Amino acid sequence: MSAIAIEISARVCDAGGAAAGGDGEAVGKGAIGARVPLVVQTAGGSVTLLTRDADEALLLRARIDAWLTGSADDFRDVPLAEGTAFQQACWRACCSIPRGETRSYSWLAAAAGSPRAARAAGQAMRRNPMPIVVPCHRVVGSGDWIGGYAGDARQSGPTLGIKRALLQLEARSSDVNSPAS
């Protein structure tokens, strides 16, 4: 029986906790906020469960760390391990949304090639395997309705504060990184 190689990396930030896992080929799972039980145990360190390519996992962690402190990384080159063709198209389109900006689910559906599939685009965001790498917090409802986050569609759910915190973090770092007028 062959072992499956998985690296799990966790970090605590202003928006909550973030964790990523993958097999050395592609990122398979990521979580943020309450969905990251390892964050409490590791307090920002990492736990390796059998890894084929620790360097790649450490590089992704370093990139996420840099993003959390203001780097404008769009993560478009990070391969994702799951998802239908439409979900993958939505996730890649989401990665094209500039830091500090938002787009609607309708925009996302159109950018993914299915302009009439706003609800399906919302479901793709709900199934996002890697929050931050695929910045689903940048996708909002029409009229800037904030919507759910990290699979929690409730308007009063605990992850909604994380979505707001990530948007505020990006707004602050966008203000700091933009040239003075």
Label the model's feature ranges.
Residues 1-115, 169-181:
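Basic nucleic-acid-binding alpha-helical/helix-turn surface characteristic of O6-alkylguanine DNA
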Residues 84, 101, 114, 123, ...:
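Gly/Ser/Thr-rich helix-start
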Residues 116-131:
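Regulatory, non-catalytic segments
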Residues 132-139:
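Short Lys/Arg-enriched helix C-cap and helix-to-coil transition segments
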Residues 142-181:
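…primarily DNA-binding HTH/wHTH and HhH modules…
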